[in-house]
């Protein structure tokens, strides 16, 4: 079996934003485990942070699938924050602030806590990096210490939808706002082979609610940043970046948990398509 540390290679997995589509990472993970390919680090952004965290902690795949079923349900966006909505029109009276969101975050936070508990980055067996965005200056923020729930909660804080999350005194929002596929984090940490799983979001034909409108704007920005990121990092000379881009023939929406088995299969298929090249790189001297 091939292992990632043979010949001095350092292999990283980066999983970008994509909500339910990020479950495709479980299919990729299945291929890596079957082939005996070890990861030296994992990097997650937005929805991708859920699965990279599960991998880094050594959770079983079945457990991670259950997380998907619990998290991406209508319940997490059903509890409207009416005070927050009114604060848009009466900002002074209702004290509009950085923690604004159209949806209360109690359900999503409860789901994350039930799965990850109080585990911290120190509990991981594989180095983990989670990317969020500073709300006030737009900087990309790489989290690698503290509670994992806090890091994920910050990384999935879709602007306008869920409130920003405070970590180490900084108000943080969705990592996709600064970099939807942060391969540069893995490069800076010394990876020379990077498996980059990214997702594009198709535009919605009709936008029927403020929540959908917020997600649509988020998708447009994410798609543009993703394309720009790939174009830029493909110019790297000392790092092999292997794009793993699942090709979904079905429409995968925010709440499409019934399609999770299909999403995982497509992730596995996309990984297998790149497997010969991955083996070739691992067999070569770093």
Please report, for each region that a protein language model flagged, where it lies by residue.
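Patatin-like phospholipase
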Residues: 1-45, 53-286
